[in-house]
Amino acid sequence: MTAAFLIYLWIVDELTFEDFQINRDSIYRLVAVEQEGGGQVKESVYTVAPLSKVFREEFPQVENATFMLNFGTLNLHSGTDLIEATYKYVDTTFFDVFSFPVIAGDPGLIKKDPQQIVLAESTAKKLFGRTSAVGREVTCQFFGQTFRYKVAAVLKVPRKSHITFEVQLSEQAYYEPINWDFVEGTSVYIQLRKGTVLSETDWRKMSRVWLNHRDKGMRLEFQLLKDIHLQTSFKDPEVGNHGNMSQIYLFTVLAVLIVFMGAFNFTTLSTARASQRFKEIGVRKVTGAKRKVLVMQFLSESLVQAFLSLILALALTELLLPLFNRFVEKDIVLTANWQTVLFVLFGIIGVGCLAGAFPAFYMSQFNPLQSFKGGSSTGKKGTLIKGLVCVQFVIAIAMVICTSVVFKQLHYLQNADLGLDKEDMVVADCGLFDFMSYMGGYGIDDYKQEVLKNPNVRSVTGGVELSDYLQGHRTEENSFSWTNEAGQVDSLRMVGVAGDGDFMETLGLTLLKGMSFGADKKAYMDGAYEKELPIVINETAWKMMNVEDPVGMLLQNKGWYGEASRIVGIVKDFNFQPLREKVKPAYLYYSRRLLNTLYIKISPENKAETLKFLKEEYEKMRPDNVFTYHFFSDALNLNYVHERQLGQMFLVFTILAIIVAMMGVFGLVALSTVQRTKEIGIRKVNGAHSRRIVWMFCREYMVGVGIAFFIACPLSYLLMLRWISNFAYQTTISWWLFPLAGCVILLIMMLTVIVQVGRAASRNPVTSLRYE
């Protein structure tokens, strides 16, 4: 029951995301839908800000609409304190639509004064400690310029919100006009009027708003706020850890199975214990007790035991919650609400009746004479109980197999050859050049020259963040066209990966043909290439172009940097997305403006000293910035948080399932030894050794494990085959996992039987024969 409680709390937590939002049932997020080549559909949460105004003005069903611009990090100063924080620009209507809990102040003030900002509670504590942050002044660094703001309010950002932030600023403070052409990081939300029911025609009309206002617009879909956490099937850059309805269903079934396993064991143990009460039942029947009275007696005893077990389960759940929260990375608490009360009542009545029904009706069926003789071991009863234990073996073996496959796939994901070097690679945010005048100075080069003087620094490069590139964006993809040998125009959509001249060498990319795009900055002036942009394509792009040797080909492209691109080389495929996705056709190019990340390859020795040196050199050049870094391998592993959590939960509940299954074996063996005490005594009198008697019992249960094994193997194989199909790159479901799982359960079962039967077989035969 403790396992069922923990799963129940986890499921409730997953199902109640966004519940703190007052308007959660009427808020929708706009999703852009783009038709790609081959009939593929790409969805993105990024649209354009003017859509919010259009929906407010053109659709009476829409009560309000808002947008937010999602950006990276900024540096906040308060006196001598300096921190790095994530930030967003929000529309003036943002706090009319969303209802984040207000700790202090008035977030609505940023409507009137763009020099006011809103802080998250955690950010306010970092800057001001326990003193009030409202009305205090903070200084922000934007692209080399300093801005001063006053704190309007401090908000609590619940964990169960898909919108997370540390700082919010008014969109009126943004330095560029936010118009129909501005797509980068813009999420739009609409709020319908209460009680509004939109027809299919209304939804269809609303879905074409962007198309109607701009030629380059896209079709829109509308995602209910409450559905974002569990029913987002596309990549969402604003949510780092989406839930999954499949996992909800999976663990619901798992909880039910564990409860049934516990109830089956309760039935077996109750029957074994009740078998010792035949004389009591006979006496009560002789004195006039009706069968209904006996049934009620057994059921009431079962309900009392279920009640006591649930009280203990609740206490154990409270004790285990901190450990469980560490496994699932949540902060779940056990609260007394009506859902929990209903769950407890269902547990008491359901488990009590389910577990007590069989012994109650079985024991009360005998007439007084049969009861005084010790009852009758009917074949039906023995077969049923053995069948229940066999079902538990099926569940336990299947869970061992599934857990093994999950961990094998996770190990594969974390250790697969990505086509690039991820070990001992320090990744740092790149704030070393002035964005507003990047043509004039290039601080990254200065930093590279300084840190490369340290022998523990092997190479440095600037590029885009690759730990989960794309992340739902569509702005990195461009369509290229060329004329093939037949004189026809071919085209291919490719993903652009920006880096400097040392990008390929530092990341360990393998050049297959041609050359890199070089490191001469004079030849690469963003937005002003004299002739053509040199690019290096990957293997996938080469194959999809269907050209024998594309090196030297000129491609046409209507990108922001120019109209023509020259292929100068081909690089071996490398993964710039999680291994759920296949490698997409991509091209590498030089762009100083897009170098938002530093990759620093360091020696595995003296890491602490090297990191300290990197930090000191960075802060010498940019004393107003915070040097934040992580290791590339750690960032890549974060892509598989769901798989790691799934594996950990499977491991915990597999161990519990094995324990529960072995308790079932223990109960069945206890029942068998009670019923066969005289048989054991007679066999010993006739010369049978204790080991032979133990083997006789083991052989019976080995048959049950064998039957369970042949049922569990195909079931678990089909289940894992379906799960593993979610990954473009998969481990093999190795054949040896199946006999390994069977052997684990068989070994534990035999140890349980040997301990229990060994005690009965070691009794004096005289005592055994006198027993009945």
Task: Describe the residue ranges of each PLM region.
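Alpha-helical transmembrane segments of integral membrane proteins
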Residues: 1, 237-240, 270-307, 318-437, ...
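Hydrophobic alpha-helical transmembrane segments of multi-pass inner-membrane transport and secretion
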Residues: 1-12, 243-279, 384-409, 644-678, ...
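Small-residue-rich transmembrane alpha-helices
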Residues: 6-9, 302-366, 408, 699-761
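Membrane-proximal extracellular/periplasmic loop immediately following the first transmembrane helix
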Residues: 8-73, 177, 183-194, 202-203, ...
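Short juxtamembrane loops and helix-capping segments at transmembrane helix boundaries
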Residues: 15-24, 160, 164-175, 231-239, ...
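Mid-to-C-terminal secondary-structure elements
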Residues: 91-104, 117-246, 449-638, 642
